[in-house]
């Protein structure tokens, strides 16, 4: 099990401004595709997506495992401490959309079923990314191809939504072409699932 303390105050303060800029272009794209009134961001860091959503009238919550993320949260009342490796049902499909960006590859394979069960319990629509083999990154311990995640979600009755994934990917690529900073891995790692 890796040490969550690598995600300290320094890590989150260095990423805060970029996270807010990311939210400014990514969240309107999501809203345009999914028209959500409620959202949960799983592995939300300091809650920049939650913050944007709440500023725009969305009932938004965040789940975060690193205490420094919560302590530096933009929405301290709405970001809850949560270990994604421990089975704990918080809400059962209570949200219009569950968002899980840059998290899946950080969950050790022995805990993946708990992680996926948690995601599937939160919403009937899930937008996530997952790093493929070879991407590498801080504390990446479970890089898997998309087919791995698609199979796990299918076992729980969630289908891979090719149309929405393509539309979202095109929107991200358009944002990049328009000058917004987009991590090079981001468009390729996107997946949308629907039950």
What residue spans do the PLM features occupy?
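A short His-aromatic
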Residues: 106-107
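Conserved N-terminal segment of class I S-adenosyl-L-methionine
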Residues: 1-101, 110-122, 133-136, 142-148, ...
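Short glycine-centered segments of the SAM/dcSAM-binding site in methyltransferase folds
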Residues: 125-127
């Amino acid at each position: 099990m890796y040490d969550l303390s690598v995600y300290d105050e320094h890590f989150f303060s260095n990423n805060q401004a970029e996270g807010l800029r990311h939210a400014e272009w990514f969240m309107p794209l999501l809203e345009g595709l999914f028209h959500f009134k409620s959202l949960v961001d799983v592995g939300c860091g300091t809650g920049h997506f939650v913050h944007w959503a709440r500023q725009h009238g969305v009932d938004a919550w965040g789940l975060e495992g690193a205490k420094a993320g919560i302590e530096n949260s933009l929405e301290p009342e709405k970001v809850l401490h949560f270990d994604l490796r421990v089975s704990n049902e918080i809400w059962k499909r209570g949200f219009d959309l569950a968002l899980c960006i840059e998290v899946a590859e950080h969950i050790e394979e022995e805990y993946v079923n708990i992680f996926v069960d948690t995601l599937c319990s939160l919403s009937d629509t899930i937008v996530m990314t997952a790093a493929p083999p070879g991407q590498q990154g801080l504390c990446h311990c479970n890089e898997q191809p998309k087919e791995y995640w698609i199979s796990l979600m299918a076992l729980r009755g969630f289908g891979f939504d090719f149309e929405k994934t393509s539309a979202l990917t095109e929107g991200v690529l358009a944002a990049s072409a328009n000058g917004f900073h987009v991590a090079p891995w981001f468009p390729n790692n996107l997946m949308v699932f629907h039950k």
